[in-house]
Curated annotation (Swiss-Prot):
The gene is frr. One of its GO terms (cellular component) is cytosol. It comes from Burkholderia vietnamiensis (strain G4 / LMG 22486). Its main location: cytoplasm. GO terms for molecular function: ribosomal large subunit binding. This is Ribosome-recycling factor.
Amino acid sequence: MSVADVKKGVEQKMQRSIEAFKNDLAKIRTGRAHTGLLDHVQVDYYGSMVPISQVANLTLVDARTIGVQPWEKNMVAKVEKAIREADLGLNPATSGDLIRVPMPALTEERRRELTKVVKSEGETAKVAIRNLRRDANEALKKLVKDKEISEDDERRASDDVQKLTDKHVAEVDKLVQTKEAEIMTV
């Protein structure tokens, strides 16, 4: 294993941490409608649970309403039930074969709770990134111990890993700020 392998590996893992954090943020409901909110809803489709996107077309009707149009008429009731039971605080209404999912307005208290959740998720992501930095630094120390690289190379590589860490932590902070602003916008 070389210094380049360590740096490349840690950067890829940090990027995956950022992607996982973005996915976690997407699950947090803001006052605005977006189809990604229903990505994790599972529907009973002939005995097996499948994501809602595999049995219905998801569209935005307006800024506060998601339209869900199941491809099969017999799925309308099942899809509506799945959305209602998804624990997202949503109350779908069916008109014909279109299910409208209005986004309820968030109360001030609920907005504050959600910003706390966002901050907490952000801290978790930053801890994961710092743990990756620690693992990379340990791998570099092992390379020095095994006499594969010099201490100067290790120090330079450590500085590079620190720069990567700072960059990814700053990205998490930026994502947290953006999501908080989105939540607090009435």
